[in-house]
């Protein structure tokens, strides 16, 4: 179940301040920013874009080809990871902020810790299955390069030591860095919600301060056997906290700014600038057009510590998206977008499946070869499997909920943060 599942039927009282509880009385902007849904209304845009992020992450994990050119990382500074973390912060704050208001800090914290434990168990399960998949392929096809490429050589050399480091989230194979980040961010959520309920703007300012200190003093979490986390939680917390701030009234208060022609013009200009910069990465002949001083100031654009250029690129994309795609955008009810929305509603399960499928696709492409046609077939097959799994989970949950309602049992609020 995705984090947004319980938000589907949650009232506007889910906000952590009195202003958000009065959201129903605030007139909507032409296509205003994502804000707390009204009673009985689901914010399908969150599900849609988290589902899109999962598809893009899956495609980005496959070997480069013509298909990978359709992902957003090739046209700007940010990628699908920013989308996923922001929406996770938004929906988690909405669901557990409501729980904190209605049931108190202790109950809300217990539910958050339960959800963090569920994500941790999913990560360990994925680690086990993923490790077995890589080892089986490398052994069966007598190609040890798979173990080296996917980063499990240290595990095979010292399994007794490495398994402990894996349980401590310090050792991870390739493509398994998102869930550990998510776990740490969820563990910080009780403190974030307490501060948000007290002073939301100050909380966001403290998050910015931590981000700045992380950059200034090069703070990071170490990994095993050497190096550091691919996604530094001390930096990426800014995007998560910003999502929480938006969910608890910040987005609603920013509606006038976001709908301003000046804001939109600045966003479009920045997106165009970032597109021109990324163009020089793939067309070397254009490299001379980039002024040397700008290059020295801008590079490297660090993903590990969420470079400010990446953060700004995501903000520009988000501002334009929420302006031109209102909450009542008709295609949101279209059957054509239903697969994306279903994937977004069950994001934990679909992410884990996507990691498994990405290596399977990588293996097929490496062993069989082939061009764009085979790559497209593998990509489409993987996405169809992800959609099928999302539909199956949704169907099972629907049947289980109907059975529970017949017995007079209520929904499991502890699963609200799922996915």
Question: Where do the PLM segments sit?
Answer:
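Alpha-helical transmembrane segments and their immediate juxtamembrane cytosolic regions
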Residues: 2-419
């Amino acid at each position: 179940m995705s984090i947004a599942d319980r938000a589907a039927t949650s009232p506007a009282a889910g906000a952590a301040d009195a202003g958000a509880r009065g959201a129903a009385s605030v007139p909507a902007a032409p296509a205003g920013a994502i804000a707390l849904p009204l009673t009985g209304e689901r914010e399908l845009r969150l599900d849609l874009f988290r589902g899109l992020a999962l598809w893009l992450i899956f495609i980005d994990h496959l070997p480069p080809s013509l298909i990978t050119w359709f992902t957003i990382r090739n046209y700007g500074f940010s990628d699908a990871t920013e989308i996923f973390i922001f929406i996770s912060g938004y929906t988690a704050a909405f669901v557990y902020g409501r729980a904190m208001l209605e049931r108190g800090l202790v109950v809300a914290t217990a539910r958050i810790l339960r959800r963090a434990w569920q994500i941790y168990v999913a990560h360990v399960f994925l680690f086990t299955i993923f490790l077995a998949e890589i080892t089986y392929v490398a052994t069966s096809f007598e190609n040890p390069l798979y173990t080296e490429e996917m980063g499990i050589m240290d595990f095979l050399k010292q399994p007794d030591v490495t398994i402990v480091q894996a349980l401590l989230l310090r050792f991870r194979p390739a493509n398994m860095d998102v869930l550990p980040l998510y776990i740490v961010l969820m563990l910080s959520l009780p403190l974030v919600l307490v501060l948000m309920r007290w002073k939301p703007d100050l909380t966001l300012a403290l998050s910015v301060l931590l981000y700045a200190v992380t950059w200034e003093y090069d703070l990071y979490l170490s990994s095993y056997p050497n190096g550091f986390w691919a996604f530094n939680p001390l930096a990426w917390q800014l995007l998560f906290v910003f999502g929480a701030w938006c969910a608890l009234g910040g987005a609603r208060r920013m509606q006038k700014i976001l709908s301003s022609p000046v804001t939109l013009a600045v966003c479009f200009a920045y997106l165009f600038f970032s597109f021109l910069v990324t163009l020089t990465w793939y067309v070397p002949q254009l490299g001379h057009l980039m002024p040397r001083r700008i290059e020295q100031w801008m590079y490297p654009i660090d993903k590990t510590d969420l470079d400010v250029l990446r953060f700004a690129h995501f903000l520009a994309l988000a501002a334009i998206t929420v302006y031109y795609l209102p909450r009542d955008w008709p295609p949101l009810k279209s059957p054509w977008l239903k697969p994306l929305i279903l994937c977004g509603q069950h994001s934990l399960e679909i992410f884990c499946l996507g990691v498994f499928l990405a290596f399977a696709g990588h293996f097929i492409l490496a062993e069989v070869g082939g061009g764009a046609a085979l790559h497209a077939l593998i990509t489409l097959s993987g996405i169809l499997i992800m959609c099928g799994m999302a539909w199956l989970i949704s169907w099972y949950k629907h049947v289980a909920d109907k059975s529970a309602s017949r017995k007079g049992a209520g929904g499991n609020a502890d699963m609200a943060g799922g996915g």
